[in-house]
Amino acid sequence: MKNKAKVVVIGGGVVGVSTLYHLAKKGWSDVVLCERKELTSGSTWHAAGLMPLFNMSYSVGQIHKYSVKFYQELEKETGQDVGFREVSNIRLAENQDRMDEYRQYAGVAETIGVKVNFLTPEEIQKAWPLCSIDGLVGAIQHPEDGYIQPNDLTQALAKGARALGAEIYRQTAVTALEQLPDDSWIVTTDKGEIKCDVVVSCSGNFVRQTGEMVGLDIPVIPVEHQYIVTEAHPQILERQKEGLPEMGVLRGSDGAWYMRCLLYTSDAADE
């Protein structure tokens, strides 16, 4: 393990490994990442992997647009599948106010360069045959939206970062952080110390503990997120046999839910 680096990234989830990769991509090859266990072992391994292009913020929308393009480029760069599926995303509207919100967003999307379609209830059912259209006013669709597999993405990012000169230390827990008078840092781990110029905390569920190391009380706690996994639906299996495309991600904005196929194969379960 190095005892000196330009940057130390704490946390081996998708955020930490993406940070490491992008620093190395920008030319900061003297960067390392410390992960207390294994990559994705925190919350990344069971993340939904959705890539919602919908965002009312121009700046955040640009990041979302970049991400969709980047995932495809990363596969080519590393030769590692990230599980990217461009299956579209449909957001339902149960009232006119919601549709007005979608139309307002369409202006932001046009400025960013994100394609959107507006669907009538009949068009919704054509795209998502299992969806009941009772009480629906319409929907907005992102045809270039979809999802990725978070674990596969993280491993591809790690492969790309290593190829650019970055180093990843698994089973290496950060136990203390100390800032020196010259503003550099001593990062103490259970494997030794690393002196660096910059520390980036991407410690996810452990961010409060990381904050305490530098005297910060960060009011963040992990919470449970419920989801239901069903057996494969007969109509979805029939669609696959007929060679029809995956129905994509369906969101109920007024009910705060989403659904999608977990795996689009003959023995798949639906989420």
Residue ranges, per PLM feature:
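Dinucleotide-binding Rossmann-like beta1-alpha1 core, especially the glycine-rich loop
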Residues: G49-A127, D254-M259
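Central helical "cap/lid" subdomain
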Residues: C196-P245
